[in-house]
Amino acid sequence: MLKKGIILLLALIPMSEVYGQLSGNNLFEYQFGNLPYTDPSDLSSHYDQLNLGYRYKGLKATLRYEHFFSQNEGSSYANLSQFQVQYRRDKLEMKIGHFNETLGNGLLVRGYDISGSVFEEEAYRTRYGFYRDMLGFSVKYSGDLWYFQALRGKSLVNTLPPSLEREDRRIDLVEGLETGITLYYQTLGLILMRNSNPFEKDYFYSLLFSGSIPGIISYNFEYAHNLADDVPVFAMDEMSRYGMYGSLSYNLGSFGLSFEYKNYHNLLIGTGISDPPTTVREHKYKVLNRSIHVPQLSDESGIQLEGYYTFNNHEHLVFNYTRSLNQFWQDFVFNEVFIEYSFYPGKKNNITLFADYATDQFKSENPRYATGAVWDYSVIGNWSTQLHIEYQYIERDLVDHSTMHNGVVIVGVSKSPGLSMSLVWEMSNDPFLNDKPDTPDVETGYRHWPGIEASYRINPTNTLSLFAGKRRGGPACTSGICYEVLDFEGVEIRFKTKF
């Protein structure tokens, strides 16, 4: 399959200038090093992802080739991981092959592709692109008054590596239909979905309402529920499977306000094809992003309220309040209050301050404080310097009461548009992180992660990045998708190109 796909696209190259357009991009990542306390410490591995596309009028063909090589036996692979043929004409779009599609707000099924992200599971030690697609077909029609989408495909279990058989990574067969009408900026829609795997077959429906009052407010609401003979279609008891999501947003010039609500119960479908909105703020700061609340789809409800205001002198204020409730054998409450303020003292300074307070009963962290500052200073010409400081204080009550301190310091210099260099230092006295598994003793005190990061854009199509040192892992969230990043000690080189 790989050879046939590459031969097909190579055959199109001579015709591309006359009959169409050929484009692509490539990501190459080399690592020399390993996880902490893991042998060998000088492990050598590399990962490569090549994406090629050909477009002629309404026809588009794409493929993705991935390979990974490591000294660890059994983790290497070389695969044609994606291919797609897409046809688009007027308001009709058809796809065959691998595709990323979402029905509604993702309460029932969501596909995604986190561009530039490389995923690795500790159990397999194999790196590959982080995406969840389907293999099958999709048809979509988007009219002025009516829209329609139908899909059928096998969903990818992206926690399993490409070194396994394809059948083992695509267990769920998803069949879905979404349709709706739009009148006077208001949309009413319906979703029907069936998910089948060797263990079960589930049926769901979903009602959609969305729209806006132009220039004033916009809203989005979805209610999803399973279809079963012994369960009423609107039941919300312990035996039911349902999800509810709603959002309101208001924007008026320099002021904006948004509100989100969620209520998910027994909404883990199949191997995890559903991925509803998290309704928690996705932080850009390291200590907060690692502490982000990850929704538990077996039972979770909550709200998020966020507002912003931009002053006449371009100062910017952001406020966010989040609350989530998990009802298991007892209630677990998550609360978070976040404030961020950006201002410009003088022509060359840009300063951002933030403060955060949270309680997380599921993690037994109460309270949890964080604060920090980012200072950008324009030196001369296109040169600037950056100082980034974060601090987090946590009280944790498990067997014993303990206090943790997490810190981040980043000192960097950059030249616009393509050069940046930074010294990164992180520290923590969290006992979950500091104990060395290769010794009989229980280590305490502080653990440190020093590192160097650099990036250079050689030209508009080629970028080279470098990391050397120790990198702290942990939870990370991007575009509403949360995953685990592994620790790393060594050297990492990335080269990205597009053509």
Model-based region annotation:
Residues 131-135, 147-200:
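Hydrophobic, small-residue-rich alpha-helical packing segments that form membrane-like cores
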Residues 4-14:
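Sec-dependent N-terminal signal peptides
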Residues 29-31, 38-47, 64, 78, ...:
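Exposed, low-structure sequence patches enriched in small/polar residues
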Residues 32-42, 51, 67-74, 84:
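Asp/Glu-centered strand-loop micro-motifs enriched in Gly/Pro and often flanked by an aromatic residue
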Residues 49-55, 62, 84-86, 177-178:
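Predominantly transmembrane beta-strands of Gram-negative outer membrane beta-barrel pores used
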Residues 59-152, 247-271:
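Outer membrane beta-barrel
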Residues 19-37, 46, 54-63, 94, ...:
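Transmembrane beta-strand segments of Gram-negative outer membrane beta-barrel proteins
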Residues 111-119, 124, 169-173, 204, ...:
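A subset of solvent-exposed loop/turn segments in beta-rich extracellular surface proteins, enriched
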